[in-house]
Amino acid sequence: MNNKKKNINTISIIKMNDIKNIHFIGIGGCSMGGIAEILLKSGYNISGSDIVSNNITQQLSKLGAKIFFKHTEKNINRSDVIVISSAISCNNPEIIKAKKLNIPVISRAEMIAEIIRYKYNIAISGTHGKTSTTAIIFSIFEDSNLSPTLINGGYLKSINSNIKIGKNPFYCIVEADESDASFLHLKPITIILTNIEKDHIETYNGSFHNLKLAFIKFIHNLPFYGTAIMCIDNHAVQTILPYIKRNIITYGFSSNADVRIDRYVQKKFTSRFIVIRVNKPTLNVTLNLPGRHNALNATAAICVATQENIDDKNIIQSLKNFQGVQRRFELSKTFTINSKSHRKKEIMLINDYGHHPTEILESIHTARFGWPKKKLLMIFQPHRYTRTKNFLFSFSKTLSNVDELFILEVYAANEAIIPGADSTSLYKTIKKNKKNFVTLILDLNKLFLNIMSKLSDSNLILVQGAGNVDNIVKTFFIKKLKQYKN
């Protein structure tokens, strides 16, 4: 690679021997696209393949990447290394060809580890809350003129991206993904552990114990002087604390936390609470995000900022002005329509990425506390057959907390169908206990009228899921609602 093409002061990626051409399989994913963009801006030749075009592939094409929309052997011609998404099958023809040609095939986390190898890395891990916590930490550092590099799993509204190459060659704030165990490649200086729950356990031979062991191993990737910032409210985190041989700071609502949250109040999209720190002034926090889970995320960020000696005034101001992350309890649209009875109906649409029962329950609680008088409807798209199978009864219990539920077909994410783990099975499981509030939508053209028939005068609709449910709702509900209004 020609070092004159890149700016060493903006991103400290050293020359990777003779690596010039890097190919991404599954380049249209949020994280994969972000990594590709960083490398592209650092002077490497980038190509990639995916099934369909999206805003990520379009952006990369504009920057000079060569994108293919079919997986074929010829896509990897002249590639020096292949980076693969965890969603890509080992039977992919590009992977098979690469192995025949002895071209290195690495995970996205291996490439992230190379990008950030010589930086002061702050890694955010855990089953839930990684993306939001990463975004909050970045925003505090950015607002404090520290200009860190960011690699995140979701788009920050403030920069309309999930990555940013910082002007400061020192700090890098990175989301660490446990879903394929690839986070073990990272070597941070500080680790945040938000929580541990049963998810992606197929990666860990179906064992929750193995998942916890992986987090313990990850934390011991810290150097002897590194720090683990851990949420003590989570039971699984409590169980691994005795096995951690690194500096630990705990946080949470618990009275046992080193950094403790108290006096939490939510008013619509805003949270207010105090954060009590050891040998530091108590902080009065106004967070521009709703929900107790986001108070925890913000407090993890406060722990990091305090450790890095960021001024309290900067911390407070940044949390107050935080713009959020796309599809994380994000206000999508509001409508007022006139019904046939000439009564006005108010509709608030909120888009949320949560796809695990615990995440969904937090969304429901946040909606209930923020808007207690509104009727709560949910359009839910299950994500992956494996997750639907593993949490069938948990989903049934959690989803029963809304007033009206509309279940779409499972978003497979390249998984094969598992009998008894489809949307119909989930619908039948819920239907056994609570008959009148759940509707199965297998024909998307019927979504609009089904929702309209369930509306009251004041409604909050949660658009829930990690797949393409947001685009489905835009096409089959919002578009028709605008026509209905006119």
Swiss-Prot record:
ATP binds at residues 126-132. Keywords: ATP-binding, Cell cycle, Cell division, Cell shape, Cell wall biogenesis/degradation, Cytoplasm, Ligase, Nucleotide-binding, Peptidoglycan synthesis. It catalyses: UDP-N-acetyl-alpha-D-muramate + L-alanine + ATP = UDP-N-acetyl-alpha-D-muramoyl-L-alanine + ADP + phosphate + H(+). Disulfide bonds: none annotated. Gene3D superfamilies: Mur ligase, C-terminal domain, Mur-like, catalytic domain, NAD(P)-binding Rossmann-like Domain. Its EC number is 6.3.2.8. It comes from the Bacteria. GO terms for molecular function: ATP binding; UDP-N-acetylmuramate-L-alanine ligase activity. Pathway: Cell wall biogenesis; peptidoglycan biosynthesis. It is found in: Cytoplasm. The keyword Plastid does not apply. One of its GO terms (cellular component) is cytoplasm. The keyword Coiled coil does not apply. One of its GO terms (biological process) is cell division. PANTHER family: UDP-N-ACETYLMURAMATE--L-ALANINE LIGASE (PTHR43445:SF3), UDP-N-ACETYLMURAMATE--L-ALANINE LIGASE-RELATED (PTHR43445). Belongs to the MurCDEF family. NCBIfam families: murC. Cell wall formation. This is UDP-N-acetylmuramate--L-alanine ligase. The lineage of its organism: Bacteria, Pseudomonadati, Pseudomonadota, Gammaproteobacteria, Enterobacterales. The gene is murC.
